[in-house]
Regions:
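A structure-centric signal for secondary-structure junctions around beta-strands
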Residues: 7, 63, 110, 163, ...
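Acidic, His- and aromatic-enriched active-site or binding-groove loops in soluble protein domains
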Residues: 8-28, 89-97, 132-151
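Alpha-helix N-cap/helix-initiation motif
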Residues: 44, 84, 88-91, 316
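Beta-strand elements within well-structured catalytic alpha/beta cores of enzymes
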Residues: 55, 65-72, 88-95, 99-102, ...
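His/Asp/Glu-rich, glycine-adjacent segments
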Residues: 6-82, 156-161, 165-171, 176-179, ...
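Secreted, luminal/periplasmic, and some membrane-associated catalytic domains
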Residues: 101-288
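Short glycine/proline-rich, acidic loop/turn segments that cap or connect secondary-structure elements
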Residues: 290-309
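Short, exposed "boundary/linker" segments that immediately precede the start
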Residues: 1-4
Protein backbone atom coordinates (compact mmCIF):
# COMPACT_ATOMS: atom_id res chain seq x y z
CA UNK A 1 0.00 0.00 0.00
CA UNK A 2 1.14 3.54 -0.67
CA UNK A 3 -0.40 6.98 -0.43
CA UNK A 4 0.10 9.74 -3.00
CA UNK A 5 0.13 13.35 -1.74
CA UNK A 6 -0.37 15.72 -4.71
CA UNK A 7 -0.06 19.49 -4.20
CA UNK A 8 -3.85 19.84 -3.97
CA UNK A 9 -3.59 18.32 -0.42
CA UNK A 10 -5.87 15.49 -1.50
CA UNK A 11 -4.28 12.08 -1.07
CA UNK A 12 -4.89 9.09 -3.27
CA UNK A 13 -4.56 5.33 -3.05
CA UNK A 14 -1.65 3.62 -4.74
CA UNK A 15 0.72 0.69 -4.27
CA UNK A 16 4.48 0.25 -4.48
CA UNK A 17 6.18 -2.51 -6.45
CA UNK A 18 9.57 -3.64 -7.62
CA UNK A 19 10.03 -3.66 -10.50
CA UNK A 20 8.04 -0.45 -10.85
CA UNK A 21 6.20 -1.70 -13.95
CA UNK A 22 4.46 -4.35 -11.83
CA UNK A 23 2.48 -1.61 -10.08
CA UNK A 24 0.80 -0.53 -13.31
CA UNK A 25 0.28 -4.14 -14.35
CA UNK A 26 -1.46 -5.04 -11.08
CA UNK A 27 -3.66 -1.96 -11.05
CA UNK A 28 -4.66 -2.50 -14.67
CA UNK A 29 -5.70 -6.05 -13.82
CA UNK A 30 -7.20 -5.53 -10.36
CA UNK A 31 -7.95 -1.83 -10.04
CA UNK A 32 -6.35 0.64 -7.65
CA UNK A 33 -5.40 -0.79 -4.28
CA UNK A 34 -8.36 0.02 -1.96
CA UNK A 35 -6.36 1.94 0.64
CA UNK A 36 -9.44 3.30 2.41
CA UNK A 37 -10.56 -0.28 3.02
CA UNK A 38 -7.13 -1.11 4.46
CA UNK A 39 -7.32 1.09 7.56
CA UNK A 40 -9.74 3.46 9.23
CA UNK A 41 -13.49 3.32 9.95
CA UNK A 42 -14.14 1.79 6.53
CA UNK A 43 -11.60 -1.05 6.90
CA UNK A 44 -13.10 -4.17 5.33
CA UNK A 45 -12.36 -7.34 3.35
CA UNK A 46 -11.75 -5.49 0.05
CA UNK A 47 -8.11 -4.69 0.82
CA UNK A 48 -7.37 -8.25 1.92
CA UNK A 49 -9.08 -9.63 -1.18
CA UNK A 50 -7.03 -7.32 -3.43
CA UNK A 51 -3.81 -8.53 -1.80
CA UNK A 52 -4.84 -12.17 -2.28
CA UNK A 53 -5.79 -11.60 -5.93
CA UNK A 54 -2.52 -9.77 -6.57
CA UNK A 55 -0.56 -12.60 -4.96
CA UNK A 56 -2.19 -15.23 -7.16
CA UNK A 57 -1.68 -13.08 -10.27
CA UNK A 58 2.04 -12.62 -9.50
CA UNK A 59 2.49 -16.31 -8.73
CA UNK A 60 0.84 -17.40 -11.97
CA UNK A 61 2.82 -15.00 -14.13
CA UNK A 62 6.23 -14.89 -12.44
CA UNK A 63 6.38 -18.05 -10.27
CA UNK A 64 8.53 -16.59 -7.45
CA UNK A 65 10.45 -18.94 -5.16
CA UNK A 66 8.88 -17.38 -2.06
CA UNK A 67 5.57 -15.55 -1.61
CA UNK A 68 5.03 -13.59 1.61
CA UNK A 69 1.36 -12.57 1.70
CA UNK A 70 -0.10 -10.27 4.36
CA UNK A 71 -3.82 -10.64 5.09
CA UNK A 72 -4.77 -7.79 7.48
CA UNK A 73 -8.51 -8.41 7.85
CA UNK A 74 -8.71 -9.83 11.40
CA UNK A 75 -6.53 -7.01 12.71
CA UNK A 76 -9.55 -4.70 12.58
CA UNK A 77 -12.37 -6.61 14.24
CA UNK A 78 -10.20 -8.18 16.94
CA UNK A 79 -8.98 -4.77 18.10
CA UNK A 80 -12.47 -3.32 17.93
CA UNK A 81 -14.34 -6.16 19.62
CA UNK A 82 -11.77 -8.55 21.11
CA UNK A 83 -12.74 -12.21 21.00
CA UNK A 84 -16.48 -11.51 21.10
CA UNK A 85 -17.46 -13.99 18.40
CA UNK A 86 -21.02 -12.65 18.26
CA UNK A 87 -19.54 -9.46 16.77
CA UNK A 88 -16.76 -10.85 14.56
CA UNK A 89 -18.36 -13.94 12.98
CA UNK A 90 -18.87 -12.11 9.67
CA UNK A 91 -15.18 -11.16 9.48
CA UNK A 92 -14.10 -14.70 10.39
CA UNK A 93 -16.18 -16.08 7.53
CA UNK A 94 -14.78 -13.52 5.09
CA UNK A 95 -11.13 -14.24 5.89
CA UNK A 96 -11.82 -17.97 5.79
CA UNK A 97 -12.93 -17.68 2.17
CA UNK A 98 -9.87 -15.64 1.18
CA UNK A 99 -7.50 -18.11 2.86
CA UNK A 100 -9.29 -20.99 1.10
CA UNK A 101 -8.80 -19.24 -2.25
CA UNK A 102 -5.06 -18.88 -1.59
CA UNK A 103 -4.58 -22.40 -0.24
CA UNK A 104 -6.47 -23.91 -3.19
CA UNK A 105 -4.25 -22.04 -5.65
CA UNK A 106 -0.91 -22.78 -4.00
CA UNK A 107 -1.78 -26.43 -3.40
CA UNK A 108 -2.68 -26.74 -7.08
CA UNK A 109 0.85 -25.69 -8.08
CA UNK A 110 2.55 -27.88 -5.47
CA UNK A 111 3.72 -25.10 -3.18
CA UNK A 112 4.56 -25.60 0.49
CA UNK A 113 2.18 -23.51 2.60
CA UNK A 114 2.66 -21.84 5.98
CA UNK A 115 -0.07 -19.96 7.84
CA UNK A 116 1.58 -17.59 10.29
CA UNK A 117 0.16 -15.04 12.72
CA UNK A 118 1.94 -11.71 12.79
CA UNK A 119 0.84 -11.57 16.42
CA UNK A 120 -1.98 -12.77 18.65
CA UNK A 121 -4.59 -10.29 19.87
CA UNK A 122 -5.92 -10.60 23.42
CA UNK A 123 -8.90 -8.90 25.11
CA UNK A 124 -8.34 -5.56 26.87
CA UNK A 125 -10.55 -3.29 28.96
CA UNK A 126 -8.17 -0.63 30.28
CA UNK A 127 -6.43 2.24 28.49
CA UNK A 128 -3.29 3.72 30.05
CA UNK A 129 -2.79 7.41 29.20
CA UNK A 130 0.95 7.40 29.77
CA UNK A 131 1.66 10.81 28.21
CA UNK A 132 -1.05 12.44 30.30
CA UNK A 133 0.62 10.96 33.38
CA UNK A 134 4.01 12.31 32.30
CA UNK A 135 2.43 15.70 31.61
CA UNK A 136 0.86 15.86 35.05
CA UNK A 137 4.29 15.12 36.50
CA UNK A 138 5.70 18.10 34.59
CA UNK A 139 7.83 16.23 32.06
CA UNK A 140 5.98 16.98 28.82
CA UNK A 141 6.28 20.28 26.97
CA UNK A 142 3.27 21.53 25.02
CA UNK A 143 3.12 24.10 22.24
CA UNK A 144 -0.25 25.74 21.61
CA UNK A 145 -1.24 26.48 18.02
CA UNK A 146 -4.59 28.14 17.23
CA UNK A 147 -5.90 27.05 20.61
CA UNK A 148 -4.91 23.40 20.09
CA UNK A 149 -2.08 21.56 21.81
CA UNK A 150 0.92 19.91 20.15
CA UNK A 151 3.40 17.72 22.00
CA UNK A 152 6.88 19.24 21.71
CA UNK A 153 9.03 16.11 21.97
CA UNK A 154 12.34 17.96 21.64
CA UNK A 155 11.53 20.30 24.52
CA UNK A 156 10.03 17.60 26.75
CA UNK A 157 11.96 16.16 29.68
CA UNK A 158 10.28 12.82 28.95
CA UNK A 159 7.60 11.56 26.58
CA UNK A 160 6.19 8.22 25.47
CA UNK A 161 5.89 6.70 22.01
CA UNK A 162 3.06 4.24 22.62
CA UNK A 163 2.44 1.11 20.57
CA UNK A 164 -0.35 -1.23 21.67
CA UNK A 165 0.80 -2.88 24.94
CA UNK A 166 4.31 -1.42 24.76
CA UNK A 167 5.42 2.14 25.53
CA UNK A 168 8.89 3.60 24.91
CA UNK A 169 9.71 6.51 27.22
CA UNK A 170 12.53 8.79 26.04
CA UNK A 171 14.19 10.86 28.77
CA UNK A 172 16.34 13.93 28.13
CA UNK A 173 18.20 14.04 31.45
CA UNK A 174 19.50 10.52 32.04
CA UNK A 175 19.93 11.24 35.75
CA UNK A 176 16.12 11.24 36.01
CA UNK A 177 15.63 7.73 34.61
CA UNK A 178 15.38 6.02 38.00
CA UNK A 179 12.98 8.64 39.35
CA UNK A 180 10.69 8.36 36.33
CA UNK A 181 10.94 4.58 36.47
CA UNK A 182 9.63 4.60 40.05
CA UNK A 183 6.82 6.98 39.12
CA UNK A 184 5.51 5.10 36.08
CA UNK A 185 5.74 1.80 37.98
CA UNK A 186 2.88 3.02 40.17
CA UNK A 187 0.50 3.42 37.23
CA UNK A 188 -2.50 1.09 37.17
CA UNK A 189 -2.18 -1.33 34.25
CA UNK A 190 1.62 -1.24 34.01
CA UNK A 191 3.07 -4.70 34.56
CA UNK A 192 6.76 -4.13 33.92
CA UNK A 193 9.18 -1.22 33.50
CA UNK A 194 12.54 -2.02 31.92
CA UNK A 195 15.59 0.22 31.86
CA UNK A 196 18.28 -0.28 29.22
CA UNK A 197 20.09 -2.95 31.22
CA UNK A 198 16.88 -4.88 31.97
CA UNK A 199 15.87 -4.74 28.29
CA UNK A 200 18.75 -7.11 27.50
CA UNK A 201 16.88 -10.08 29.00
CA UNK A 202 14.17 -9.58 26.34
CA UNK A 203 16.64 -8.81 23.50
CA UNK A 204 15.09 -5.36 22.97
CA UNK A 205 18.00 -3.12 24.08
CA UNK A 206 18.21 -1.42 20.69
CA UNK A 207 20.01 1.91 20.46
CA UNK A 208 16.72 3.58 19.49
CA UNK A 209 14.56 1.85 22.09
CA UNK A 210 13.24 3.98 24.94
CA UNK A 211 15.29 4.75 28.01
CA UNK A 212 12.42 2.92 29.67
CA UNK A 213 10.16 0.34 28.05
CA UNK A 214 6.80 -0.26 29.69
CA UNK A 215 4.79 -3.45 29.23
CA UNK A 216 1.09 -3.36 30.05
CA UNK A 217 -0.95 -5.87 32.00
CA UNK A 218 -2.71 -8.45 29.82
CA UNK A 219 -5.95 -6.45 29.89
CA UNK A 220 -4.41 -3.01 29.30
CA UNK A 221 -2.85 -0.97 26.48
CA UNK A 222 -1.16 2.44 26.05
CA UNK A 223 -2.67 5.45 24.28
CA UNK A 224 -0.67 8.31 22.83
CA UNK A 225 -3.08 10.94 24.24
CA UNK A 226 -1.31 13.87 25.92
CA UNK A 227 -3.99 16.60 26.14
CA UNK A 228 -6.03 16.99 29.32
CA UNK A 229 -9.02 18.69 27.66
CA UNK A 230 -10.57 17.22 24.48
CA UNK A 231 -11.37 20.75 23.32
CA UNK A 232 -7.61 21.31 23.01
CA UNK A 233 -6.81 18.04 21.25
CA UNK A 234 -4.88 18.65 18.01
CA UNK A 235 -6.86 18.60 14.77
CA UNK A 236 -5.18 15.37 13.66
CA UNK A 237 -6.46 13.53 16.75
CA UNK A 238 -9.87 13.21 15.07
CA UNK A 239 -8.36 12.10 11.75
CA UNK A 240 -6.83 8.94 10.36
CA UNK A 241 -3.32 10.37 10.52
CA UNK A 242 -0.62 7.84 11.33
CA UNK A 243 2.26 10.23 10.56
CA UNK A 244 1.59 13.04 13.03
CA UNK A 245 0.40 11.12 16.07
CA UNK A 246 3.19 10.32 18.57
CA UNK A 247 2.03 6.74 18.91
CA UNK A 248 -0.37 4.16 17.53
CA UNK A 249 -4.09 5.01 17.56
CA UNK A 250 -6.46 2.03 17.11
CA UNK A 251 -9.45 4.33 17.73
CA UNK A 252 -8.96 5.38 14.09
CA UNK A 253 -11.07 2.33 13.21
CA UNK A 254 -14.19 3.98 14.63
CA UNK A 255 -16.45 6.84 13.68
CA UNK A 256 -17.57 8.85 16.70
CA UNK A 257 -20.49 6.79 18.10
CA UNK A 258 -21.66 9.71 20.26
CA UNK A 259 -22.43 11.89 17.24
CA UNK A 260 -25.79 10.84 15.71
CA UNK A 261 -24.98 12.76 12.52
CA UNK A 262 -21.47 11.39 12.04
CA UNK A 263 -22.29 9.36 8.93
CA UNK A 264 -23.93 12.38 7.31
CA UNK A 265 -20.84 14.40 8.17
CA UNK A 266 -18.60 11.76 6.62
CA UNK A 267 -20.77 11.65 3.48
CA UNK A 268 -20.52 15.43 3.13
CA UNK A 269 -16.74 15.32 3.52
CA UNK A 270 -16.53 12.53 0.94
CA UNK A 271 -18.61 14.59 -1.49
CA UNK A 272 -16.17 17.49 -1.10
CA UNK A 273 -13.28 15.13 -1.80
CA UNK A 274 -14.91 13.70 -4.93
CA UNK A 275 -15.64 17.24 -6.13
CA UNK A 276 -11.98 18.18 -5.80
CA UNK A 277 -12.38 20.45 -2.77
CA UNK A 278 -10.20 20.36 0.29
CA UNK A 279 -11.72 18.42 3.14
CA UNK A 280 -10.95 17.27 6.67
CA UNK A 281 -12.36 13.85 7.53
CA UNK A 282 -12.49 14.65 11.25
CA UNK A 283 -14.85 11.86 12.30
CA UNK A 284 -12.64 9.83 14.68
CA UNK A 285 -13.66 9.73 18.38
CA UNK A 286 -11.34 10.38 21.31
CA UNK A 287 -12.69 7.50 23.40
CA UNK A 288 -10.03 4.87 24.11
CA UNK A 289 -12.57 2.67 25.94
CA UNK A 290 -13.88 1.59 22.53
CA UNK A 291 -10.83 -0.67 22.03
CA UNK A 292 -11.37 -4.27 23.15
CA UNK A 293 -8.26 -6.03 21.78
CA UNK A 294 -4.51 -5.36 21.74
CA UNK A 295 -1.15 -7.11 21.55
CA UNK A 296 2.52 -6.86 22.46
CA UNK A 297 2.73 -8.25 25.98
CA UNK A 298 4.77 -11.48 26.23
CA UNK A 299 2.85 -12.50 29.35
CA UNK A 300 -0.62 -13.22 27.91
CA UNK A 301 -2.30 -16.62 28.17
CA UNK A 302 -1.23 -19.18 25.57
CA UNK A 303 -4.65 -19.20 23.93
CA UNK A 304 -3.79 -15.73 22.62
CA UNK A 305 -0.37 -16.65 21.25
CA UNK A 306 0.28 -16.30 17.50
CA UNK A 307 0.18 -19.55 15.51
CA UNK A 308 2.42 -21.29 12.99
CA UNK A 309 0.63 -23.85 10.80
CA UNK A 310 2.38 -26.06 8.26
CA UNK A 311 2.32 -29.63 6.95
CA UNK A 312 5.23 -30.62 9.21
CA UNK A 313 4.29 -32.27 12.49
CA UNK A 314 5.87 -30.72 15.57
CA UNK A 315 5.26 -30.87 19.30
CA UNK A 316 7.43 -27.90 20.23
CA UNK A 317 6.58 -24.24 20.56
CA UNK A 318 8.51 -21.93 18.27
CA UNK A 319 10.30 -18.78 19.30
CA UNK A 320 9.69 -15.87 16.90
CA UNK A 321 13.30 -16.06 15.69
CA UNK A 322 12.76 -19.72 14.71
CA UNK A 323 10.28 -18.79 11.98
CA UNK A 324 13.06 -17.74 9.60
CA UNK A 325 14.62 -21.21 9.67
CA UNK A 326 11.24 -22.92 9.32
CA UNK A 327 10.58 -20.96 6.14
CA UNK A 328 14.01 -21.83 4.75
CA UNK A 329 13.32 -25.53 5.38
CA UNK A 330 10.35 -25.27 3.01
CA UNK A 331 12.52 -23.79 0.27
CA UNK A 332 15.73 -25.84 0.44
Amino acid sequence: AKTLFPYTTLFRSDCYSYPATLRNELQEQLGTFPLFSFWGPNANIKSTQWIADASIYVDKKYNPTLNLIYLPHLDYCLQKFGNDFTKISKELGEIDQVVKQLVDHFESVGAEIILLSEYGINPVNQAIHINRFLREKGYIAIREERGLELLDAGASEAFSASDHQIAHIYIKDKSKIEKIKREVSTLSGVKLVLDKKEQEAYHIQHQRSGDLILIADDNAWFTYYYWLDDAKAPDFARLVDIHRKPGYDPVEMFMDPKNPFIKLKAAYKLARKLSGFRYLMNVIPLDATLIKGSHGSPFVEKQFYPIFVSSNESEKELEPVDVFDEILKKIF
